[in-house]
Curated annotation (Swiss-Prot):
This is Endoribonuclease YbeY. GO terms for molecular function: metalloendopeptidase activity; RNA endonuclease activity; zinc ion binding. It comes from Lysinibacillus sphaericus (strain C3-41). Coiled coil: none annotated. Zn(2+) binds at residues 122, 126, 132. Its cofactor is Zn(2+).
Amino acid sequence: MILTIDFTDETNEVAAQHTELVEKLLQHAASVESIEPETEVSVTFVTNDTIQDINREYRGKDQPTDVISFALEELGEGEMAVTFEGMPRVLGDIIISTDRAKEQAEEYNHSFERELGFLAVHGFLHLLGYDHMEPEEEKVMFTKQDEILQTFGLGRD
């Protein structure tokens, strides 16, 4: 196991099989990205109301979204990287709205599992520094995302 993943289900509705799917998929993504062993990440499942509150507070957008990531290694202006020898690398937090995942699965006509996996990988790649603000960045991130999902078996039908 490469990643230590701390799961929190604030909805109390996520089935064990879905948590296991996300666990296996993120382990696969970590392998594809050559992440060092004992790296930590947290995944929290929330409702649309909760993610809307987070989106409003941290992004200034008063609406629900599907996934938000908080990268602990992302440095702000003037900040210096601090590392502690012998301590595990902590990537950050992935927060997924299961309500939005269900809505989007229906909207895009694919399974809840595929959407949940997509959102987990999308959030994970953000923790690693991938972004999609510029067209070239988007191409790189979405290509990597598709590769991970496809090789895991959750590609588009």
